[in-house]
Amino acid sequence: MAKEKTTLPPTGAGLMRFFDEDTRAIKITPKGAVALTLILIIFEIILHVVGPRIFG
């Protein structure tokens, strides 16, 4: 007699797949996020040092 084959459910059944969604948000690479963070940190340090002289 032949064995009956049982099929398993597909993996991730019922879970949302994020890469399938179409979003209109700004897409930024990880390198861009790190660069933007470093720019903001440097800008804040400059304001902390020079700011009291400018703004009193």
Curated annotation (Swiss-Prot):
Extracellular side, ranges: 50-56
UniProt subcellular location: Cell membrane
Keyword Cell membrane found: yes
Gene Ontology biological process terms in this record: protein transport
Main location: membrane
UniProt key word Transport: yes
Keyword list, A-Z: Cell membrane, Membrane, Protein transport, Translocation, Transmembrane, Transmembrane helix, Transport
UniProt membrane topology term: Single-pass membrane protein
Family: Belongs to the SEC61-beta family.
Protein name as catalogued: Preprotein translocase subunit SecG
Organism placement in taxonomy: Archaea, Methanobacteriati, Methanobacteriota, Thermococci, Thermococcales
